[in-house]
């Protein structure tokens, strides 16, 4: 294992009956990074987290933690803690008692417990809430207590299984920022599970996109969004226009009946490929100036932009623009070479 990896999954396979949940999955997780396992329901992300935590056992493969194989180590002996969507707080205990619970089990001195609990309350911005009943707290406050209870034990890794799922949108966005702040302040590894693309893009150092028990792509939020590895990733991470094309040469691609300059290279000449264009990368221009031309068939106001649908003879293009367009009007679309992303064509993802 490389020195900067804290966890390494090697060829993890897991099945329930005839259903393969994880298919020979391998993954390296670095020290001090915020890594997100992202994918739709049933993709295997939560099972991966549970195998790391020790709540599930892999059928085959190894879980390596700091150079030691931990497949047979029970959860309570692993140097990591888990926060679930259902926070599992003790309703008969107040905030202080919930956070102190694990420390009391370890029979730590009272003054040490008091110091550590106060440090956690400050970290999660709940100073002054020590004596509050759990049921008197909001969902966001309860979640902070759950995070403090997990972190007070000083784990080397914190596992978070869709912990924001029960919160409303405003609270969720606030907690995204809070979680990232806490992770950066503590400098420990966070492994976060979600199906929410915005959450993953907002918080992560590294995103692992999963589907059908396999890793589709792993990289920074910028790489995942701007350079999707395949059509599944392109469709799952934000909205995309995806069309068939032909790579004529390095930096030269043909699609939608015309030739465009692009920034991709390394494909075979005349190789069949797929072209990805993000809706926000289209520029709306006069009809006669357009690289692509069509008729506006739909305009939906989304708050920060209009979602505009433009149809030509063979394609329907979706673009996001702050300018309004009239339904039935003919407009042109312009593209920079950097906005045209090329993917290898796959028959089935």
Swiss-Prot record:
Matching InterPro entries: AAA+_ATPase, ABC_SmlMolc_Importer, ABC_transporter-like_ATP-bd, ABC_transporter-like_CS, Mo/tungstate-bd_C_term_dom, NA-bd_OB-fold, P-loop_NTPase, PotA-like
GO CC annotations on file: ATP-binding cassette (ABC) transporter complex
Amino-acid positions noted as binding ATP in the UniProt annotation, renumbered to this chain: 39-46
Catalytic activity: ATP + H2O + polyamine-[polyamine-binding protein]Side 1 = ADP + phosphate + polyamineSide 2 + [polyamine-binding protein]Side 1
Classification via Gene3D superfamilies: 2.40.50.100, Nucleic acid-binding proteins, P-loop containing nucleotide triphosphate hydrolases
Keyword RNA-binding tagged: no
Membrane topology (UniProt): Peripheral membrane protein
Gene Ontology MF: a single term: ABC-type putrescine transporter activity
Transmembrane segments: none
Keyword DNA repair: no
PROSITE patterns: ABC_TRANSPORTER_1, ABC_TRANSPORTER_2, POTA
SUPFAM superfamilies: MOP-like, P-loop containing nucleoside triphosphate hydrolases
Function (record text): Part of the ABC transporter complex PotABCD involved in spermidine/putrescine import. Responsible for energy coupling to the transport system.
Family according to the record: Belongs to the ABC transporter superfamily. Spermidine/putrescine importer (TC 3.A.1.11.1) family.
NCBIfam families referenced in this protein's UniProt entry, alphabetically: MMSYN1_0197, potA
Name of the molecule in the record: Spermidine/putrescine import ATP-binding protein PotA
Organism, as annotated: Clostridium perfringens (strain 13 / Type A)
